[in-house]
Amino acid sequence: MNHATSELHDESAVSIVPETTRLQDLSALVKMGIVNSNTLTVFTGFWLALHFNGLSVMDNLDKLFFTIVGSALIMAGVCCLNNYIDRDIDPLMERTKNRPTVTGKYKPGFALAFGLVILLLGFVFLLLTTPMAVLISFIGAFTYVVLYTLWTKRKYTLNTVVGSISGAVPPLIGWAAIDPSLNHPIAWMLFLIMFIWQIPHFLALAMKRVDEYRNAGIPMLPVVQGFDITKRQIMIWTVCLLPLPFYMSGLGITFMVIATLLNIGWIALGLYGFRQQDDIKWSVKMFVYSLNYLTILFVSMIVVTFF
């Protein structure tokens, strides 16, 4: 449930709608890229809950199926609702101007109905695991659709922080499907990692797309406060990730070393280019690093449990 950002600059020419298949349109409607990336964090939470509770994945294949399918449907549902709500500003932004709710491939009513149906279906699937998993997923969905998309996205620079709450719950959903008590510290470290990671990730993207956000009237931090303050905020949040691996000693020294090196690498990259290159180039490097960071970190959490 990680939150998706959207963009574009003014164009005087009439936009040409690209030819797309029905599958491509559906993928854009539910934002499959977001669903796929968040599914990794759901699975990681599920896997680590099994590991620390001494359970076998083979004995919990049914719960794994319900958890992955349920959480994926919920994420797809809230993304549909996001497309429905943002259909008035999506034409103003480059990455979203060809979404099916903008081009007319899907009518707004369909996007709304389809989003609600698969959202509810996702809750049903998760109900076959634990009520806590349903509760956490509801909190994530409510935060993304209501608190982020409907309320803060168009009004406050804190929209990034609010959206990061919803993006941080997927690993907790996975964990709660196995261990609804959520009393293991690593479960909450997963939440904190995802919450903190999203802020420099999306602020870097906002720097890259600053003109498009400005034209669309979305008050992202670089639009309102400029690049200098945004860069400082990116560095502050990146540094906040540094101590977290040391609260995850249960995963072993190998993981702690990998995570610490990833954190140091991100900080070093930010400091190295902080005043030595143009701001857009810096933001692109920070954004790309953040993507690789998250994938390597969460895959590492799974791999180290085999040794």
From Swiss-Prot:
First and last residue of the signal peptide: none
GO biological processes: heme O biosynthetic process
InterPro entries: Protohaem_IX_farnesylTrfase (IPR006369), UbiA_prenyltransferase (IPR000537), UbiA_prenylTrfase_CS (IPR030470), UbiA_sf (IPR044878)
Transmembrane residue ranges: 32-52, 65-85, 108-128, 131-151, 158-178, 186-206, 251-271, 287-307
EC numbers for this chain: 2.5.1.141
Top-level lineage group: Bacteria
Broad class of the protein's primary localization: membrane
Transferase keyword on record: yes
Pfam families named in the record: UbiA
Location of the protein in the cell: Cell membrane
Pathway membership: Porphyrin-containing compound metabolism; heme O biosynthesis; heme O from protoheme: step 1/1
One term of GO molecular function: protoheme IX farnesyltransferase activity
Keywords, in A-Z order: Cell membrane, Heme biosynthesis, Membrane, Transferase, Transmembrane, Transmembrane helix
Disulfide bonds: none
Topology in membrane: Multi-pass membrane protein
One GO CC term, this protein: plasma membrane
Family: Belongs to the UbiA prenyltransferase family. Protoheme IX farnesyltransferase subfamily.
Additional remarks: Carbon 2 of the heme B porphyrin ring is defined according to the Fischer nomenclature.
NCBIfam families (UniProt xref): cyoE_ctaB
Biological role stated in the UniProt entry: Converts heme B (protoheme IX) to heme O by substitution of the vinyl group on carbon 2 of heme B porphyrin ring with a hydroxyethyl farnesyl side group.
Assembly and interaction partners: Interacts with CtaA.
Listed name of the protein: Protoheme IX farnesyltransferase
Organism of origin: Bacillus mycoides (strain KBAB4) (Bacillus weihenstephanensis)
Gene (UniProt): ctaB
